[in-house]
Amino acid sequence: MNRRQFISSSGAAAAALSSGSTTQTASAAPAKRALMKLGTETQLGDARLKSLARYGLKNVGGAPPRAEGSVWPALDDLKRGREAAEKNGISYDIVTPPILASSQIDRERHPAIMLAESPERDRDIEQLQTLVKNCAAAGIPAFKYNMSILGVLRLPARVPGRGDATYSAWNFKEAHPATPLTKAGRVTADRFWERITYFLERMVPVAEEYKIRMACHPQDPGVPPEGYQGVDRVLGTVDGLKKFLSIKESPYHGLNFCQGTVSEMLQDPGKEILDVIRYFGSRKKIFNVHFRNIRGHRDNFVEVYPDEGDVNFVKAIQVYKEVDYSGMLMPDHVPQAPDDPGGQQSFAFCFGYIRALIQAVDQMG
């Protein structure tokens, strides 16, 4: 075969392969894309937003700057927060209100909803209803909140991690159940559910009217059925979360799904968490994700870097893709180090790790 014949036959073969490939591609179903986004909770100052854009973030949640002396963000505050984010190529997707935080009730500035104190709780609920209306007017689709009395429970001493990092930990056997009651006193499961129901009955219809998603964080961590410090932790189990969502069924009533916290509810999180993600995700009840890993299990765990915990994050992100989850994956409770007291290096590590996972799972088809 001379050179001209070789080139001619090679070209014909290439054309045939190309034609076959085109036919095969045309007949194949389009690849399933990963819809989730890298995100974080943040302040909305320009310098901070610029630094987040540097790491490839395009979506955030947080509290907007407020006028001095004001407790609640006004509509203009929300618009300024959204505009500040957009100026840096970032979407402001979820608002953090000034009440119903994860702090312990004795430190909470506005505890009336969780203490069932009237008329103060009705006033606070009205303020949240106004926030929902303002979110709709400002073009921000969701807000997140906690229904917690004890706040986030951890042991005072941190645990050595890799390098010079330290990790937060919880071990119920090493905690102090005899710790005095909070100002809430004894709160049985029935009383806790009454307070939750009172809140949801007044908030969910407004959220539906204005099409704003309400994303509730589970109680962190779950504790035994007898509770802790006199408080039954009703949102500290998977069954509790299911009951919570059933109280007022709505596409706008769902979860700020802290994967770390839910893992803390389980005896074998590495095996169990995937089906939990699948359960809530397939029902479109996951509005935001705190993408955090642990080593351990219910009542005894350590919060670690995302790549070294008991939950396989590759498998986890595949399930989020499977259920078409389209919200944010946020780092949360990152390790600390002596030269990184604010955790910025740890957050940067998590941003890169999560971004790479999203890109990888997107290519898997």
Positions of PLM-derived features:
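Residue-level marker of alpha-helix boundaries and capping positions
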Residues: G39, W72, D122, W193-E194, ...
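Active-site-proximal loop/turn and secondary-structure-junction residues that shape catalytic pockets
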Residues: T42-D46, R66, T96-A101, M147-G151, ...
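C-terminal segment of N-terminal export signals and the immediately downstream linker at the start
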Residues: G20-Q43, K50
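Histidine-acidic metal/acid-base catalytic patches
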Residues: R3-S21, K32-L35, M114-L115, E126, ...
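Structural motif corresponding to the early beta-alpha repeats
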Residues: A63-T197, E201, E208-E209
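Surface-exposed cleft-lining segments at the edges of enzyme active sites
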Residues: P180-R195, P221-D232, E303
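Catalytic domains of carbohydrate-active enzymes, especially glycoside hydrolases
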Residues: L44-A63
